[in-house]
Swiss-Prot record:
Function: Catalyzes the reversible conversion of 2-phosphoglycerate (2-PG) into phosphoenolpyruvate (PEP). It is essential for the degradation of carbohydrates via glycolysis.
This protein's UniProt keywords: Cytoplasm, Glycolysis, Lyase, Magnesium, Metal-binding, Secreted
CDD domains found in the cross-reference section: enolase (cd03313)
UniProt organism field: Wolbachia pipientis subsp. Culex pipiens (strain wPip)
Record: residues binding Mg(2+): 243, 284, 311
Essential cofactor(s): Mg(2+)
Keyword RNA-binding: no
PANTHER family named among the record's database cross-references: ENOLASE
Higher taxonomy: Bacteria, Pseudomonadati, Pseudomonadota, Alphaproteobacteria, Rickettsiales
Top-level taxon: Bacteria
Major localization listed first in the record, in broad terms: cytoplasm
Matches recorded under Pfam families: Enolase_C (PF00113), Enolase_N (PF03952)
Protein name in the entry: Enolase
Length: 424
């Protein structure tokens, strides 16, 4: 493979979808090819995520500036990787990890290392005149089933809902584009239903509606009504998913939500009953990230019926994923590149999940940009699932639109596993 020498590295401060600063990195190669990547930011974060370096200068952006991360890229990182081969991704990422030297990227910042890592991959792909998804992965390409967030709650919205995300999964579609079409129709029907009931149709951080409804079951009933109003059914076209973000309402050893206090055992039973009542096939962060016994009990009780996704539990970290596999906690891993800080480590987490029979779901963050790298990672890795928000807000739609472009470019080679095979 021809060497693709890095000639320049540049970073700048830009804004994410919440109006807070984030870092954007540009890499240029000696042949003139360039790569640009912008890094997202989370609101609901796991305690063991790689560190997002912020300036803590209250005089700028309420302390959330990222000039220190920009300086990391333009200084120590640039000095080390200029002259290196952009086509050797693992070597670049190894340098980034070693330069930082901490367990959680706290010296340089995971926002700095990820920006560089992704921009390097994009520059190399552009140099080879190859789409990023082809550059990152070989073989058959599977389009992901989208987990589309239509109602927001928790820390992603200013309403009374304790659960963070209520999602539809278009498992009955035959193509990705059809999945987006029928989901958009449900989204617009949901808007109409909310309006008729006198609810606000304002949207939350991830583009889903944020009506001031008070219960999980009311949210689920509204979604089912919207599916049926759009001319579809839960039996043939859609299933439901939840991101509970249980760590956000775990306090003093109990789960406090909807005016109740439940033990781990009681919460597991609550989920069991909810799954029996509604067509829910995926539940994310159902237990607090440190409630290992709760996770084990949940997995025993529901692991053969429902996709149980660990986000805060695993934070895209191979050591934590390995522990979860060994102790039989959850059966799926949410993959967020900025939780770990490099592309190589992201793919290692995906591979570890797959090799051990766990599913992997590529995910955005609540603070996003127009960057579409995760769309390419989803296709390149053949994960089969992606979580990137609702069907509003251009920062979310950018990912869906990019996936439709990828599907179009693949033509007949684009595979979308529908129906019961969605978990393949």
């Amino acid at each position: 493979m021809m060497k693709k020498t890095i000639s320049s590295v540049f970073a700048r401060e830009i804004l994410d979808s919440r109006g807070y600063p984030t870092i954007e990195v540009e890499i240029e190669l000696c042949d003139g090819a360039t790569g640009r990547a912008a890094v997202p930011s989370g609101a609901s974060t796991g305690k063991l995520e790689a560190l997002e370096l912020r300036d803590q200068d209250e005089k700028r952006y309420c302390g959330k500036g990222v000039l220190k991360a920009v300086q990391s890229v333009s200084g120590v990182i640039a000095n080390k990787i200029i002259g290196m081969d952009a086509a050797n991704q693992s070597a670049i990422d190894k340098v980034l990890i070693e330069l930082d030297g901490t367990k959680n990227k706290s010296k340089l910042g995971a926002n700095a290392t990820l920006g560089v890592s992704l921009a390097v991959a994009k520059a190399a792909a552009n140099s080879f005149k190859t789409p990023l998804y082809k550059y990152l992965g070989v073989g058959e390409k599977q389009m992901p089933v989208p987990l589309i967030n239509v109602i927001n709650g928790g820390v992603h919205a200013d309403n009374k809902l304790d659960f963070q995300e209520f999602m539809i999964l278009p498992v009955g579609a035959e193509t990705f584009s059809e999945a987006i079409r029928i989901s958009a129709e449900v989204f617009h029907n949901l808007r109409s239903i909310l309006k008729k009931k006198g609810y606000s149709t304002n949207v939350g951080d991830e583009g889903g509606f944020a009506p001031n409804i008070g219960s999980t079951e009311e949210a689920l009933n509204l979604i089912i009504q919207a599916v049926e109003s759009a001319g579809y059914s839960m039996k043939n076209h859609f299933a439901l998913g939840l991101d509970v973000a249980a760590s956000t309402f775990y306090e003093d050893g109990v789960y406090k939500f909807e005016n109740r206090e439940l033990t781990s055992e009681e919460l597991v039973q609550y989920y069991f009953d909810l799954v029996g009542k509604y067509p829910i096939i995926s539940i994310e962060d159902a237990m607090n990230e440190d409630d290992y016994e709760g996770w084990k009990l949940l997995t025993v009780k529901l692991g053969n019926k429902v996709q149980l996704v660990g986000d805060d539990l695993f934070v895209t970290n191979c050591k934590l994923i390995s522990k979860g596999i060994e102790e039989k906690m959850a059966n799926a891993v949410l993959i967020k590149p900025n939780q770990i800080g490099t592309l190589t480590e992201t793919f290692a987490a995906i591979e570890m999940a797959k090799l051990n029979g766990y599913r992997a779901i590529i995910s955005h963050r609540s603070g996003e940009t127009e960057d579409t790298t995760i769309s390419h990672i989803a296709v390149a890795s053949n994960c089969g699932q992606i979580k990137t928000g609702s069907l509003s807000r251009s920062d979310r739609l950018a990912k869906y639109n990019e996936l439709m472009r990828i599907e179009s470019s693949l033509g007949e080679n684009a595979k979308y596993y529908c129906g019961l095979a969605w978990t393949s």
